[in-house]
């Protein structure tokens, strides 16, 4: 929100554009905060009309949920954030590490796939959403926080000392 409490940013502006086009008034927007698992169900149940958030497009979500995805709006990849003090330079050095992840997310599935493919162990510590996972990482509950790379950069700025965290080069 801005100083007056009005929501700002890409997602809310997209909502306002849809409201203007469909309802003739950009201010006829009612927002509801939800996490990934509840938002898809709410859309399918007709509790909300659209979801605007940086959800990862996957083929199974596109064809298996009965929902219509728009075009991809941001092209990104999964990233990994670690504390500089670990001295880690690559994802390949994270065998046995603990990861703070959002439960049920593509981030969780991708991490599991990567470590299984590379015959490496890791421990997944899951949370209800990305914000909770980031807060747990910042509090020292995990070695690694993972989400989309552009999200990592933004989230890192909210940490106690952003300069103490580094985004690994792998995507």
Positions of predicted regions on the chain:
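Short loop->beta-strand "edge-of-pocket" segments that line small-molecule binding or catalytic clefts
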Residues: 1, 8, 92-108
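Short, hydrophobic alpha-helical packing/hinge segments within bilobed ligand-binding/sensory domains
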Residues: 14-15, 38-43, 133-136, 142, ...
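Conserved functional loop/turn residues at catalytic and ligand-binding sites
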Residues: 47, 98, 141
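Short, well-ordered beta-strand segments
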Residues: 1, 51, 81, 98-102, ...
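Short beta-strand-to-loop elements that line the ligand-binding cleft
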Residues: 26-35, 101, 120-130
């Amino acid at each position: 929100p801005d100083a007056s409490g009005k929501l700002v940013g890409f997602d809310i502006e997209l909502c306002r554009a849809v409201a203007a086009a469909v309802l003739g008034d950009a201010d006829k927007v009612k927002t509801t905060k939800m996490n990934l698992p509840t938002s898809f169900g709410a859309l399918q149940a007709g509790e909300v009309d659209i979801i605007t958030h940086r959800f990862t497009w996957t083929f199974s979500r596109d064809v298996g949920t009965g929902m219509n995805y728009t075009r991809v709006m941001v092209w990104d990849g999964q990233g990994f954030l670690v504390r500089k003090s670990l001295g880690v330079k690559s994802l390949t050095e994270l065998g046995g590490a603990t990861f703070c992840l959002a439960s049920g997310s593509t981030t969780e599935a991708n991490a599991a796939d990567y470590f299984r493919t590379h015959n490496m162990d890791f421990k997944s510590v899951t949370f209800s959403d990305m914000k909770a996972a980031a807060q747990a990482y910042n509090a020292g509950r995990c070695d690694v926080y993972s989400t989309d790379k552009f999200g990592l950069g933004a989230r890192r700025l909210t940490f106690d000392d952003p300069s103490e965290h580094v985004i690994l080069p792998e995507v």
